[in-house]
Amino acid sequence: MAKHLFTSESVSEGHPDKIADQISDAVLDAILEQDPKARVACETYVKTGMVMVGGEVTTSAWVDIEEITRETVREIGYVHSDMGFDANSCAVLNTIGKQSPDINQGVDKADPKEQGAGDQGIMFGYATNETPILMPAPITYSHLLVQKQAEVRKSGKLDFLRPDAKSQVTFQYDQGKIVGIDAVVLSTQHCDSVTTPDLREAVMEEIIKPVLPAEWLNKDTNFFINPTGRFVIGGPMGDCGLTGRKIIVDTYGGAARHGGGAFSGKDPSKVDRSAAYAARYVAKNIVAAGMADRCEIQLSYAIGVADPTSIMVETFGTEKVSHDIIIEAVRQNFDLRPYGLQEMLNLLQPIYKKTAAYGHFGREEFPWEATDKAAILRDFAGIK
């Protein structure tokens, strides 16, 4: 592929689907804090004036679902009916039940190391050296834009902004290298009193320019700031939100394949989540080791079975050592059984709420972003 465009999008923490994700993961964290081996599958639905939290949980812990829900919505910034949603007055419905014993018998084993996968499925992980964090640039900068929107909103610098927002960035590539940004879209909810020209100028000066590198912007870059001209009704009043509806935003912005399983609200026994994190960890360490410029990992599992049913490594012709060496390096240096994933990445801890907005990958505070295996892989492959 010579010259081409590639686009990714992100959404803010105040987007309805992201409200749902954050509530689901806040519940998960609260349970894991008391019971690290709990089984949790928590789903959330939000709409005007109400939140419904449901799913299946097996745990010795007790958590206050209503208070967790209200506090999460409060932190996001929906604290007044003028915004279309109010953490203090919305209804909170709890419909959580217990996990099926049929599932549990396949997961729990006498030997913890033989813990079976919580479900069948396919999971992908990806890394590329086009950014320092080994993530695709389009999704990286889309996340940074909506993170900046939240920052200037919460600090009061742009106090007319409201929590709901979306971003989209189109990058120009030539021979696989970034040469510029072709288009930027940023839509943000706002109060009724601000004018569209004032909002557009403020967003350009306080959000877009501080985030996007100037060398990638030029006279031909197209900027679309609130292109409809008005975005007062937003959040759950504008659209209902559901856990797990932003799986491409959560991962690689479409630059890599996706197995279809969502992350939020699931404890680490669910390989939809833990194996996707492990696949990112493997791919990132391969790229960090200099074994390839780009790497995609696919893992697959059968319910109740510990070992993956398959491991696939794709390097898109960018490998620096033989494909067989890369495959063998993965098999010998990464324990990809469910128990191994949890131990390798220290997943039985309450770290998930902060993953639920602005992407699960490319953020150094998460254990699956470590490149601690890179030196080992270099030695294995004989890379100097």
Swiss-Prot record:
Binds 2 divalent ions per subunit. This is S-adenosylmethionine synthase. NCBIfam families: metK. One of its GO terms (molecular function) is ATP binding. It catalyses: L-methionine + ATP + H2O = S-adenosyl-L-methionine + phosphate + diphosphate. Its cofactor is Mg(2+); K(+). Its main location: cytoplasm. Mg(2+) binds at D17. Residues 99-109 are annotated as: Flexible loop. Disulfide bonds: none annotated.
